[in-house]
Amino acid sequence: MQIPFSVYWIPLDVQFTDKPSLKDPVMIAAWPGMGFLAKISADYLRRRIKAKQFAEIKYFHNVLVYKNGIVEMAPIKHKLYASEDQNLIICVGDAQPSVPEESLRLAQKISDIAVEMGVKRIYTMAAFPNEFYDEPKVYGVFTDESMRDELIETGVEMIENDGAVNGLNGVMIGVAK
């Protein structure tokens, strides 16, 4: 009989395949959520600007997969892409951790990589349930007043009510702040 173990003891595996040449890049991070909107948008952006993968983070989800009756741990991948032309890093994940502690651990690892790459600003993407509008809108929450004012000038609308940012998006904002 095997002794149960905690996935928290398994280190997050980061593999770099390249070190892009960037100067104070911006990072956009996205994970699947409502309607996969953020992941689809980030994947579209990375393809559109021809960003190249330079790293991958793997961690294990609390799900086992099986094939022909044999189970194995299912790694979840978060790929990091860079566009030197746009001075941009895009982090796209296959899934969000289902355990809050794992969200914190993953957000810290992404933040560590961002710091190592010289990133000063991280934007996360997520869908926001709202009424249908003919013209799409972009809503945001901000880590400080100066960022709020700057982004409102670009057309980002502030979410007016109090609320919460759930999942990895909220944790990433908190860790990066």
Regions found by a protein language model. Name each.
Residues 2-95:
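N-terminal short beta-loop-beta anion/metal-coordinating cradle
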Residues 31-32, 94-101, 154-163:
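Flexible, glycine/proline-enriched loop segments at strand-loop-helix junctions
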